[in-house]
A protein has these predicted regions:
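Active-site-adjacent loop and "lid" segments of alpha/beta metabolic enzymes
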Residues: 198, 285-295
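Active-site or pore-adjacent capping/gating segments
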Residues: 294, 305-319
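Flexible, glycine/threonine-enriched loop-and-boundary segments that flank and lead into catalytic domains
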Residues: 253, 276-287
Length: 319
């Protein structure tokens, strides 16, 4: 628990919500149906991405277990099992602190402190798990190469981080996780560190092809992992940004088709745009909305798949 570490206590929450265990993530997403087809969760996490992704998947599975328990009237039976588990452990069961927000019915909190496989028959649990993994939608950033190059939130060696990325992708393939992007290959941070549009695109595509080569070296099929790759670019007001997405898509598709023999689905480059944070000023702050609007217009005309526009006060404080 980072709250017990005096050397890092002051950093908690500086870059997002603090999640140090499965129960933390269950509390965070309580009330949201993570396996619903209308729910898609994007996690901007890199160094500890495999662990956070595991928390997320298990939280989604346990939510579906809770729904099964409720639909089959097993609440009392399961509650008794949980009480026995904690009596044997001799510790206090974790609980949600405070009142639930309006509209939150507490989905995800009934199994707080335990997991579905501890309270349900293994056959039932495995069926729920298999179905849930094919339904979850979202993205985890997990791009370790751009961390080395730009953002520097590295907690493992590059070699070990790449191995974990490969492990995650193999798990996605083996378990039929088709609606979740295992990596968001990111140029945004490279641009924020000073790269121009051309350099941003060059580094980002180079990183993408590095992942392709590495996954292929581990025996994975390009048509199975290709659809799990996504991209993330910055957008400024330089003229090259008007076509960065189209150029990226053409280069990626040609290489995936001609060099790697990928099918049409694996040739598709899906990308998210975030308007440029470093282009916004604390002094002439009234111009920030204009800058962001122009950048968003570039992105829309370039047919981005999704778009994030930065806040008016981005240059002053954490959004």
């Amino acid at each position: 628990n980072p709250g017990e570490r005096p050397d890092i206590y002051g950093k908690i929450g500086n870059a997002g919500v603090s999640i140090c265990c499965l129960d933390d993530l269950k509390k965070l997403y309580s009330g949201f149906e993570l396996a619903n087809s209308m729910t898609s969760v994007s996690m901007t996490i890199n160094g500890p991405a495999p662990m956070l992704l595991a928390f997320f998947m298990n939280a989604a599975i346990d939510q579906e277990c809770e729904k099964y328990i409720s639909e089959n009237g097993l609440e009392n039976q399961v509650q008794q099992k949980i009480e026995r588990i904690y009596k044997n452990k001799g510790v206090v069961r974790p609980k949600y602190q405070g009142e639930l927000p309006e509209g939150n019915k507490g989905l995800g909190l009934f199994l707080l402190g335990v997991t579905g496989d501890e309270v349900l028959d293994n056959t039932i649990y495995q069926k729920i798990k298999t179905e849930t993994l094919t339904k979850v939608r979202g993205t985890v950033q997990a791009d370790i190469l751009k961390e080395d190059q730009a953002q520097n939130t590295c907690i493992f060696s590059t070699e070990f981080a790449l191995k974990m990325m490969g492990d995650v992708q193999e798990y996605f393939i083996d378990n039929g996780i088709r609606n979740f992007y295992s990596v968001s290959i990111s140029g945004y941070h490279i641009a924020e560190a000073g790269a121009n549009p051309i350099s941003q695109l060059a580094f980002t595509l180079a990183n993408g092809f590095t992942y392709v080569e590495y996954y292929l070296s581990r025996g994975m099929d390009i048509n199975e992992f290709g659809p799990n790759l996504s991209f993330f670019f910055s957008n400024g007001v330089d003229p090259e940004y008007a076509v960065i997405g189209r150029v990226a898509r053409r280069l990626w598709a040609k290489a995936m088709k001609n060099k790697y023999g990928a099918n049409k689905r694996a040739q598709m480059l899906k990308y998210h745009i975030q308007t440029s944070g470093r282009s916004l000023h604390a002094q002439e702050i009234d111009f920030n909305d204009i800058r962001t609007t122009l950048q968003a217009l570039y992105a829309i005309y370039d047919n981005c798949n999704s778009l994030h526009t930065n806040a008016y006060d981005e240059a002053i404080t954490t959004p």
